[in-house]
């Protein structure tokens, strides 16, 4: 369970640490993935450094006070994220135990899965193991050391923004500016899945419709598999369907990530009569009987909100299922039952 900084005992502790200078910090003790017994890292989407954001959260209900127990907790967390949520690894870049040690998550160079819209521009740090609901002085000190280390070594911008604040508007270390009101989800670019170069007609923007689709093939839960799935889809659409490019504007994996198809500015090939006026968003997989997971649904909704905010989609858009405008099973009944509850849906 993740919580924000609203615990009544947290403020006095944090205020004490605000008096400390980051210049006085030392190097953190980092327990490596090998040391805590991590399963193989399968998240491979790189993080562009230094990142401008720092996200700090807390994992509750799992206590530990020493490295052996805390390592076991981190292994359990990794297993939960991979097997229950279908993600490619543990959600955070680093975790800080109540024993005062830092545990390597996906590390410095790989995107985490902690905060939709910020995974590609932030370091995600999570406290865990506390008995009383707020981090121990040792954990707070270790986090301060970790932040200082990240800045000194070029992983975190010296002018970083910390979006999540205390209700009293105090945070672990001074924040530097306001959080933007809305942030777009991380979109894995065409270059990451090694897209073939194409030259297709331009989109008529802003789009007036959103059409939700499923690919009807296999789903993917890990970024490496999703990258292959998108690349294979493009090849099938070009070589077998004689399309100009991959049919969809964007694809969403069960890893909770959005993958760029033809993108915002190019016509899709997903729905006859709508390709130049509708954004086609495809969930990778078959969702006739079972719906997509929560992470992928949130990613798609965030993408739609982003499209409106960026001017790619009109604010009074209509959202439809693929089957509403084509004689086809897509997006599958299980997914259709969900999207018909979304804003702007029109049967």
Curated annotation (Swiss-Prot):
Region annotation (Interaction with murein) ranges: 270-275
Indicate where this protein is primarily found.
secreted
The UniProt keywords, alphabetically, are:
Antibiotic, Antimicrobial, Disulfide bond, Glycoprotein, Immunity, Innate immunity, Repeat, Secreted, Signal
Under InterPro entries, the record lists:
Amidase/PGRP_sf, Amidase_domain, PGRP, PGRP_domain_met/bac
Show the coiled coil region(s): none
- Gene Ontology MF annotations: N-acetylmuramoyl-L-alanine amidase activity; peptidoglycan binding; peptidoglycan immune receptor activity; protein heterodimerization activity; zinc ion binding
The signal peptide, as residue positions, is 1-26
Q: Where is the N-acetylmuramoyl-L-alanine amidase domain?
A: 77-185, 206-328
Annotated compartments? Secreted
Keyword DNA-binding assigned to the entry: answer is no
- Tissue-by-tissue expression: Detected in lung, spleen and stomach, and at low levels in eye, heart, thymus and testis.
Residues with an annotated glycan are 120
CC per GO annotation: extracellular region; protein-containing complex
- Disulphide bonds annotated for this chain are 184-306, 200-244, 220-226
Q: Which CDD domains match?
A: PGRP
Q: Which GO terms describe its biological process?
A: antimicrobial humoral immune response mediated by antimicrobial peptide; biological process involved in interaction with host; defense response to Gram-positive bacterium; detection of bacterium; innate immune response; killing of cells of another organism; negative regulation of natural killer cell differentiation involved in immune response; negative regulation of type II interferon production
The entry marks the following residues as binding peptidoglycan, namely: 237, 248
SUPFAM superfamilies, sorted: N-acetylmuramoyl-L-alanine amidase-like
Give the function comment from the record: Pattern receptor that binds to murein peptidoglycans (PGN) of Gram-positive bacteria. Has bactericidal activity towards Gram-positive bacteria. May kill Gram-positive bacteria by interfering with peptidoglycan biosynthesis. Also binds to Gram-negative bacteria, and has bacteriostatic activity towards Gram-negative bacteria. Plays a role in innate immunity.
Q: What's this protein's family per the entry?
A: Belongs to the N-acetylmuramoyl-L-alanine amidase 2 family.
Q: What does the record note on quaternary structure?
A: Monomer. Homodimer; disulfide-linked. Heterodimer with PGLYRP4; disulfide-linked.
Q: What is this protein called?
A: Peptidoglycan recognition protein 3
Organism the protein comes from: Mus musculus
Query: Top-down, what is the taxonomic lineage of the species of origin?
Result: Eukaryota, Metazoa, Chordata, Craniata, Vertebrata
**What is this protein's gene name?**
Pglyrp3
